[in-house]
Amino acid sequence: MKPIYEENEETLEIAEQISCHIPPHLHKSMELVSVTEGTLEIGVGTELYHMEKGDFALVFPELIHHYQVFNSESCKAIYALASPLLAPSYTKELQQFCPVNPVILAQEVLPDVNYALRSMLVYPAASQGHVLHQAFIQIILARTLPLFEMIDNSSVGSNDIIYQTVSYFAAHYTEELTLSKMAHDLGISQSSLSRVFSGTFH
């Protein structure tokens, strides 16, 4: 099973790659997504949002999210995991809020955003790259955050078992976990929890 809680030590990871189904997960980084071919579905919390070529999405840190590809044709996107440390002037927004809808439609995405994403693909994550990456992330946030309607991030939750499972992993990822302990702590049966693992996190 692939990890569903990721603690990214790197400041920035970015790649353009073929999109695929990615099960629910969360991490301390913000995730930036720009569809370059085809279509993609991004789920944040319990909501699913459709993305087409040119659309941009921003997933704030510590929010459970996943990806699905329903298009039979190729789908590619630029995916970036960026530490909030790259955007110190936006710390409060990134920690306390999140967009009602994380997707900005292609026609509303400003050219600066695409330029910054493409530029980060070019510059290596070396010492001079870090300064450039910080500048590019600041540009992206400065140009996209005003386009979002924000809500308190504590309101993006759910009592559903998948959400509870991922949240549990996030809170206890440094501990040794067993199916019986986790089921007990979540107040569900071991067989129900086992079905979540086999059906969702395969």
Regions found by a protein language model. Give the residues of each.
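A short, Lys/Arg-enriched amphipathic alpha-helix from helix-turn-helix/homeodomain DNA-binding modules
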Residues: L110, N153-L177, K181-L186
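Basic/polar phosphate-binding segments, predominantly the helix-turn-helix DNA-binding elements
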Residues: E176-H202
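Generic protein-terminus/edge-of-domain signal
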Residues: M1-F56, L63, N71
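All-alpha amphipathic helical-bundle segments outside canonical DNA-binding/catalytic cores
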Residues: Y123-I139, V156-N159
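Generic detection of well-ordered alpha-helical segments
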Residues: Q138, A142, D160-Y163, S167, ...
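Solvent-exposed, amphipathic alpha-helical segments
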Residues: G38, D112-A126, I161-H172
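A hydrophobic/aromatic-rich effector-binding and dimerization subdomain
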Residues: M1-A15, V59-Q128, L141-M150
